Amino acid sequence: MAILLKNGLVYQEGEFIKEDVLISGSKIQAIGLDLPEEGAEVYDLKGKLLAPGLVDIHEHYREPGFTYKETIKTGSEAASRGGFTTVCTMPNVDPIPDDLETFEKQVALNEANSCVHLKQYGAITEDLTSDKVVDMAALKEAGAFAFSNDGHGIQQAGTMYEAMQEAAKVGLAICEHIQDDSLYHHGVMNAGKKAEELGLPGILGVSESAQLARDLVLAQATGVHYHACHVSTKESVELIRIAKEYGINVTAEATPHHLLLSEEEIDGNNGYYKMNPPLRSKEDQFALIEGMLDGTIDLIATDHAPHSREEKAGDMRKAAFGIIGNETAFACLYTKFVKSGQMDLSLLLDLMSYQPAKLFGLDAGVLAPGKEADLAVFDLDHAEKLSEEDYLSKGVNTPFTGQEVYGMTALTFVSGKLVYKSKHFAD
């Protein structure tokens, strides 16, 4: 059956236009006014924003191995509630997809359980911590989206150089968790005034920027597409800015939590504020925002990382690193930056859809006839209080719970199929 989305504010090619969208099967059939309703299931959007489905290139689903934290089903359902229709998942599961057989099993598991388009990262090295680079050609053939050891920085320059050479040969990106362990010192939050106040071990900002500087030189030497994951420091933003001026093939992401929060917002010794990289200083936060606005930061990615309540309870020294975010990212960012006038809505949408799709060669992020009907409808006028009871993720580990936000998702369609409908939507 055809689906007609009426009276939407459609975001198309950088413009917002009041028009309708007709879906036939898995594709967008037409965009315009007065499209035929006969034989179609009709949704009256009543002026809500109709946008390309969002694209998140950095999420952690814990299946197989850690399904008490999250499953592919719950993670993808949470993503759909956040308006995401394409998601790329990291390889820190058990077993790790670092060889062809394991990777193919992971892809089959993803396809059987996800309600959104799910792209799978391959590991850069075996076990995510060794110095043996995986068979990248074989993993690309099996469908690898890119390569990452996320959660672990690659410590040896020679290993990274070899990995970059191999990734460049197969034409896929190296997406790096930037962390020099010799400068990391097993900290639990940013090394700064807040850590001193709480008596907690700190993580130096230079543990990120020093390794980033090394990697940018190696990327220049190899020509690989090097992607800097969850950038968090002022120095990292400046290094990326300079690297782009030199023509190095580097892209970078920032997370919603690093854009929205700094260490100053940390509410005591609270495990829900423990993430890696940590929340940095206000100066770092402002540098990230500036980088987002001037194009140094290419895209926003959630780093959705669910854990059990027990793993996040209490003391930061014992709590796991990570924060959930795929259900709340767009609404929190819209409320903070767009409603306040700091940022255009078109830029936010591009950073969360068009940009990641374009930079990583994904067929997503654009609304046009003939394209896959991956769509998200956002209610920009309805205020909603974020509540644990509403989360579709198994994880509730976020400090944003209790905040009132605008722009939560009303409807999400993946390949023309309705995969999420808000309890607040009345058509």
UniProtKB/Swiss-Prot annotation:
The gene is pyrC. SUPFAM superfamilies: Composite domain of metallo-dependent hydrolases, Metallo-dependent hydrolases. GO terms for biological process: 'de novo' UMP biosynthetic process; purine nucleobase catabolic process. Catalyzes the reversible cyclization of carbamoyl aspartate to dihydroorotate. Keywords: Hydrolase, Metal-binding, Pyrimidine biosynthesis, Zinc. This is Dihydroorotase. GO terms for molecular function: allantoinase activity; dihydroorotase activity; zinc ion binding. Zn(2+) 2 binds at residues 150, 177, 230. Pfam families: Amidohydro_1 (PF01979). Its cofactor is Zn(2+). Belongs to the metallo-dependent hydrolases superfamily. DHOase family. Class I DHOase subfamily. It comes from the Bacteria. Substrate binds at residues 60-62, 92, 276, 307, 321-322. Its EC number is 3.5.2.3. Zn(2+) 1 binds at residues 58, 60, 150, 303. GO terms for cellular component: cytoplasm. It catalyses: (S)-dihydroorotate + H2O = N-carbamoyl-L-aspartate + H(+). The active site is at 303. Pathway: Pyrimidine metabolism; UMP biosynthesis via de novo pathway; (S)-dihydroorotate from bicarbonate: step 3/3. Binds 2 Zn(2+) ions per subunit.
